[in-house]
């Protein structure tokens, strides 16, 4: 585990995804106010953020907006990726972390999702002994992960 600036990592992921975001007509807002240092495997954290952002772009609807934010509690940094659109059906919330599970198979075919991304996210976060999750909102869905910080 190394200490790194997650804002720098997320900025890079957003830049890498800019062509896809433009094609999908999605507006990405990243709310940051300077460096945020966390502990983890930078490569694996990048994989989690990339997965969350790609899923958000594929499922954004309505205002087609994605918001990335930080919150802090008990020595942890929570990174949240929210997208406007339809909430995930309540009965599917626990299952989305299972390999090959797809909530809407017809929609998944549209963008070519394999159903393994969130299972990889869960495995990575479990390997860090940290939490990840999903929260439905009236106007969209928020995926989050927590990492230790010394901020």
Show where each model-derived region lies.
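Short conserved segment of the HATPase_c
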Residues: 88-102
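Conserved glycine-rich
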Residues: 129-130
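A residue-level detector for a conserved hydrophobic packing site
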Residues: 45-46
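Conserved catalytic submotifs in the C-terminal HATPase_c
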Residues: 2-3, 27-36
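Short beta-strand/loop element within the Bergerat-fold HATPase_c
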Residues: 63-75
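Short alpha-helical Gxxx[C/S/T] motif in the catalytic ATP-binding
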Residues: 112, 117, 121
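Short helix-loop "hinge" at the ATP-lid/N-box region of the Bergerat-fold HATPase_c
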Residues: 56-57
């Amino acid at each position: 585990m190394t200490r790194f600036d997650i804002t720098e990592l997320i900025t890079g992921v957003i830049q890498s995804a800019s062509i896809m975001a433009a094609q999908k007509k999605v507006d990405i807002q990243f709310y940051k106010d300077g460096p945020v240092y966390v502990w983890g495997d930078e490569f694996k954290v990048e994989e989690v953020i990339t997965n969350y952002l790609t899923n958000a772009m594929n499922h954004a609807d309505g205002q087609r907006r994605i918001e990335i934010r930080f919150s802090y509690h008990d020595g942890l940094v929570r990174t949240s990726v929210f997208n406007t659109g339809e909430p995930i059906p309540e009965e599917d919330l626990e299952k989305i972390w299972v390999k090959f599970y797809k909530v809407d198979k017809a929609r998944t075919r549209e963008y070519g999702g394999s159903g393994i991304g969130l299972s990889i996210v869960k495995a990575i976060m479990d390997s860090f002994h940290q939490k990840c999750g999903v929260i439905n909102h009236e106007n969209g869905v928020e995926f989050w992960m927590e990492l230790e910080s010394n901020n």
